[in-house]
Amino acid sequence: MSYTTATADSDDGMHSSIHNESPAPDSISNGCRSRGKRSVLKKGPWTSTEDGILIDYVKKHGEGNWNAVQKHTSLARCGKSCRLRWANHLRPNLKKGAFSQEEEQLIVEMHAKMGNKWAQMAEHLPGRTDNEIKNYWNTRIKRRQRAGLPLYPPEIYVDDLHWSEEYTKSNIIRVDRRRRHQDFLQLGNSKDNVLFDDLNFAASLLPAASDLSDLVACNMLGTGASSSRYESYMPPILPSPKQIWESGSRFPMCSSNIKHEFQSPEHFQNTAVQKNPRSCSISPCDVDHHPYENQHSSHMMMVPDSHTVTYGMHPTSKPLFGAVKLELPSFQYSETSAFDQWKTTPSPPHSDLLDSVDAYIQSPPPSQVEESDCFSSCDTGLLDMLLHEAKIKTSAKHSLLMSSPQKSFSSTTCTTNVTQNVPRGSENLIKSGEYEDSQKYLGRSEITSPSQLSAGGFSSAFAGNVVKTEELDQVWEPKRVDITRPDVLLASSWLDQGCYGIVSDTSSMSDALALLGGDDIGNSYVTVGSSSGQAPRGVGSYGWTNMPPVWSL
């Protein structure tokens, strides 16, 4: 009995096997049966006689309708077996042999894109069957694995890698969208209330209102309390940490009780800013707001010798040392106020300190001042403030040199009110300049109250005054500053030293304050006798300790 290599047809496809050429005894009984004749169909390898019958049938009827072969011929084969035999072995355009280099390259490229789609690959390779392509690929995998070579060439691997990444990203995005949609549906269908624990955690980091007030006071005094924990939660209305003092050595005697003198954060958040559109308010130490002060300035808070500004305040370009005369500044005025009657009077070049005080604090703005002149660059940097300071000082010195000998009474007193109440005999004294030489500043002599001036005692009030002279080279620094008092810069501890020609008598400052406040404030004062054995220095002498409630804490 001889054995040959043949191709057997099966439902799984075509495969090679070694079998006996003669049919098995039970092949007919176990074979396929035809529907009409109930004949048993033959299985197993094809014979040359069966191949000839199939070739003749295809030449006459063409390809297709493989189930009709059994009807028109004596071939006892099913339609599937006839189709596979013709496609894999008997068709005339079938290519036999090994694959060419071009065919191998095309198979590798198509497998990188399609995968194990053998039938689709066979359509692009005419004359090659899907079974041949599959056998070639499996053989290639085993051969390259043994040699340790990559399955795909480098150029094909890079292209396939990009394609795989894009495909993976698209799948990840699709899966992520599905998960979000499912989470959203679960969140919408849930009956439990949603608790925002993160908000509670953030609220725990925020300090309380009392802590914030302490924090603001300490930050503005430069005590180093601006920790990084509170900086990110600081309200936008409060001054930023960059505007805080660099060190706390300027007022080393300030204690923790300063927090009572500053407004709480609730005041800054709830109080509306009521500002005159043409006013640029500034105050040396405006920590408490009195009814009289609220008429001329908006709610503000500013510490001297600092550039910290709140509620649109504009800092002074030059720190003020020594005694500052309590008077409405040049930047603080209204259109309908009585200060429009003031006339700008330049101060003599006594010193740089007095020039800065007269220019920024004492001299009221002229009537032709525009809104742009009132320090219009409110939100600009420090350069504009320095230029503004230089401009004012230059104009003051220039007007001093070009002015006539006839000058006003003083830069801190109301010239209009004084000249109206002065008798005719005293006008010559003022015009001659004799009185001005002895009454240049508050630090050189004493001033009487407006009631005495109106009574006609102008000449007699200043008859016994003695001009007090001080050396200008004297250097003095305050030993103690009580910043909790609104009259800290006018207290006797500052004035008793007599530095820079500042008046050493507090009665003169009270008189100037009475002249500034008008009749309403001046009439509310009560004359207090001197406790010492010396005679009273003037009719309008008052004590700071017995001031009315409007000025005391």
From Swiss-Prot:
Gene3D superfamilies: Homeodomain-like. Residues 1-44 are annotated as: Disordered. GO terms for molecular function: DNA-binding transcription factor activity; transcription cis-regulatory region binding. Mostly expressed in roots (e.g. root tips), stems, pollen, shoot apices, flowers and floral shoot tips, and, to a lower extent, in leaves and siliques. Residues 66-90, 118-141 bind DNA. GO terms for biological process: anther development; anther wall tapetum morphogenesis; gibberellic acid mediated signaling pathway; negative regulation of cell population proliferation; negative regulation of growth; pollen sperm cell differentiation; positive regulation of DNA-templated transcription; positive regulation of programmed cell death. It is found in: Nucleus. SUPFAM superfamilies: Homeodomain-like. Disulfide bonds: none annotated. SMART domains: SANT. One of its GO terms (cellular component) is nucleus. Its main location: nucleus. InterPro entries: GAMYB-like, Homeodomain-like_sf, Myb_dom, SANT/Myb. PROSITE patterns: HTH_MYB. Pfam families: Myb_DNA-binding (PF00249). Keywords: Activator, Developmental protein, Differentiation, DNA-binding, Flowering, Nucleus, Repeat, Transcription, Transcription regulation. It comes from the Eukaryota. Residues 38-90, 91-145 form the HTH myb-type domain. Disruption phenotype: Reduced expression levels of aleurone-related genes (e.g. CP1, CP, GASA1, BXL1 and BXL2) in seeds. The triple mutant myb33 myb65 myb101 has a male sterility and exhibits slower protein storage vacuoles (PSVs) vacuolation rate in aleurone layers upon seed germination. The myb33 myb65 double mutant is defective in anther development, with a tapetum undergoing hypertrophy at the pollen mother cell stage, resulting in premeiotic abortion of pollen development and male sterility. This sterility is conditional, fertility being increased both under higher light or lower temperature conditions. PANTHER family: TRANSCRIPTION FACTOR MYB33-RELATED, TRANSCRIPTION FACTOR MYB65. Transcriptional activator of alpha-amylase expression that binds to 5'-CAACTGTC-3' motif in target gene promoter. In vegetative tissues, inhibits growth by reducing cell proliferation. Promotes the expression of aleurone-related genes (e.g. CP1, CP, GASA1, BXL1 and BXL2) in seeds. Together with MYB33 and MYB101, promotes the programmed cell death (PCD) the vacuolation of protein storage vacuoles (PSVs) in the aleurone layers during seed germination. Together with MYB33, facilitates anther and tapetum development. This is Transcription factor MYB65.
